[in-house]
Amino acid sequence: MPRKGPVKPREIMPDPIYRDVLVHKLINKVMVDGKKSKAEKIVYGAMQILAEKTGEQPLEALHKAIENLKPILEVRPRRVGGATYQVPMEVPPRRQISLALRWLVEAARNRSGRGNYTMLEKLSNELLDAYHNRGNAIKKREDTHRMAEANKAFAHYKW
């Protein structure tokens, strides 16, 4: 741990087109090998497709999809007397966003189908699924909540 006190989180600048921090974070999650312009094309294209299919503004549709993906509870390991318990805990707001974005991009990358789908198509389909509360990323959130519910008996071990 640093001796100078807690480390302040860096401020993330909003993206140039939508002027939104969440879009910038999504671009950074999609980016591979530092190819940011490619990641921007993928994210902006996916947002346009999402807006066309939902009939909402691209930014509103993205925010709703991410809101649907945010986990409320998760389990964290806690050692008590030689045994490790999975203790359900509330997820802090910053972690909710980072988990939601991670699950979204992971689900889009693992998404398969007939034909050669581009990452743009995969991401837009996964965003649309998240918007409608379905898909692999939503399944991941539900699994996390199910684990927390199953281990509710250990909730008194919170620290």
Curated annotation (Swiss-Prot):
GO terms for cellular component: small ribosomal subunit. CDD domains: uS7_Bacteria. GO terms for biological process: translation. Keywords: Ribonucleoprotein, Ribosomal protein, RNA-binding, rRNA-binding, tRNA-binding. GO terms for molecular function: rRNA binding; structural constituent of ribosome; tRNA binding. Belongs to the universal ribosomal protein uS7 family. HAMAP family: Ribosomal_uS7_B. One of the primary rRNA binding proteins, it binds directly to 16S rRNA where it nucleates assembly of the head domain of the 30S subunit. Is located at the subunit interface close to the decoding center, probably blocks exit of the E-site tRNA. Part of the 30S ribosomal subunit. Contacts proteins S9 and S11. This is Small ribosomal subunit protein uS7. It comes from Sulfurihydrogenibium sp. (strain YO3AOP1).
